[in-house]
Structure formats: structure tokens, C-alpha cells
């Protein structure tokens, strides 16, 4: 299954969650898109509830179904912690997400583009793979040639706060993952237990 590249606001309204993290998609119209959007949300079945939760998280991180399910399987092989929390931590450690969390981009989609276009380095080496798994202590930085990009400077200036599991040097435009993200650090609007139930059926 290919990655969705259409308008994120349509998916946000359909799933009832802000995929950009800004909340703007739902500010004016909190119902699903289309002529019957206001009336479309009836009571979901157990399967429907699990599927919607899975789709919310998958679209939030901008992943294909194959990428998402493969990472879920990997999380299940981690011996410590719960399957759901380990899965969430692996999602957070994707390079595109870390670029977003450091405040080098205003959305995950924008962060993915920065990585794809070669603007980001890890430990001094250019990495253009959004799914690259960042390890604790690795330095994520903007390439010297890219430091004057308005899209990056504007994103850094707009940051209000950063998660406690990252450190950031605004002068150097670089940061790092200082520890594995704990479940309480991450999105409280996601019920990962529903996703575990969905895949374990």
C-alpha cells in the first residue's frame, strides 16, 4: 500500500485527530469531510474502533501499511516493556519524526521532505532515509549548506517547547535523543492497546 499524499486535513477530519499537530484542521470543522460529514459518525464496531485507532497513528507518522505493520512486528520482539509502548517508542525514533520533534520542521510531512532532500545529517553523515532509526546519543543536524533555509529557520523560531527526551542547540541547529521515549512522553490521545488488539486478531 502506498503512502497517502493527498490533503492531510481530509484525513484529519475523517479520523477526528490533527495529523499536523497544529489542530487547525479541526478548529472550524470537527466533522468528517463530504456532504454527510456531520451525520456520518455513528457508533463503530469493535473492529472499526481498532482500525480507526491504527489508521490515526499510521497517518500521523505518514507511513505505508507495510512500514507500519513491519515496525509493529519488530516492537513485539523487544523483551522489556509492553508491545504497545515499545511500538510507540520505535515510531518516535524515526529520523523524520526526530527532525520534527527537534523543531527543525513544523510538521512531520515537512520533516520527511527535509530528510528526503538531503538536508539532514546523523553523526556528521548525510542520511536521506526518513525511517532511519535514531539511537540514543546520535547527533541530528542540519547540513551546513542548508542552515540558511527559511523553512528551517522559521520552524526553529516557532518552537514553543520540545520533548524532554531530546536536547537541542539552536545556534548549531543540531540535537540528539538523550533517552528512549517513555510512554508518558508520547501522544496521550492514542490508545495503542487497540492497535495491539487489531494486529493480534
Swiss-Prot record:
GO terms for biological process: ribosomal small subunit biogenesis; translation. Keywords: Ribonucleoprotein, Ribosomal protein, RNA-binding, rRNA-binding. SUPFAM superfamilies: Alpha-L RNA-binding motif. InterPro entries: Ribosomal_uS4, Ribosomal_uS4_bac-type, Ribosomal_uS4_CS, Ribosomal_uS4_N, S4_RNA-bd, S4_RNA-bd_sf. Residues 93-156 form the S4 RNA-binding domain. GO terms for molecular function: rRNA binding; structural constituent of ribosome. Residues 26-46 are annotated as: Disordered. GO terms for cellular component: small ribosomal subunit. SMART domains: Ribosomal_S4 (SM01390), S4 (SM00363). Residues 35-44 have a biased composition (Basic and acidic residues). Belongs to the universal ribosomal protein uS4 family. One of the primary rRNA binding proteins, it binds directly to 16S rRNA where it nucleates assembly of the body of the 30S subunit. Part of the 30S ribosomal subunit. Contacts protein S5. The interaction surface between S4 and S5 is involved in control of translational fidelity. PANTHER family: 30S 40S RIBOSOMAL PROTEIN, SMALL RIBOSOMAL SUBUNIT PROTEIN US4M. This is Small ribosomal subunit protein uS4. The gene is rpsD.
